[in-house]
Amino acid sequence: MSSADAVSQNTQDAFSSFRLAFVQGQSLATTGNAVVALPILNGGIGGGSFILRRITVSNPSNTAGGTVPSLATANVTILTSSDGNTSNAVTTSGGQTLGNVTAANTWQDLTLASGASTTAYTANALFVKVGVAVANTAVNISVFGDVVSF
């Protein structure tokens, strides 16, 4: 029989589809590069690498209170650099609209760039570039993937 704490002894590189990064209540009300930083493993990836599997935008909220505004016109790109250089995009480089994030309790997986299917990334953080903002909005962003090494 296995030990009851066997799973707790494993690390992220022993599991697939681990949540690599998460930010809660991040504003999409302002355009710009690196509006939101997504530190990988809370900044603990060190010299390792990871494979991206999914990036989910969820739980929209109205920062001014009241009904959640539709984010259907919001446009975001996720990058490995904070300079806005779209050659470093891990999602669609031209940005992706959040057409499914239109009310409370809605979510959307972002389309990963073609390079994400064959690349193990080493960046310590990912960055959100907001191309088109929506006033008084905030969302949660989750990044899922596999840790290749620490």
Write out the residue ranges for each language-model feature:
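Surface-exposed, low-hydrophobicity beta-strand/loop segments enriched in small/polar/acidic residues
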Residues: 2-150
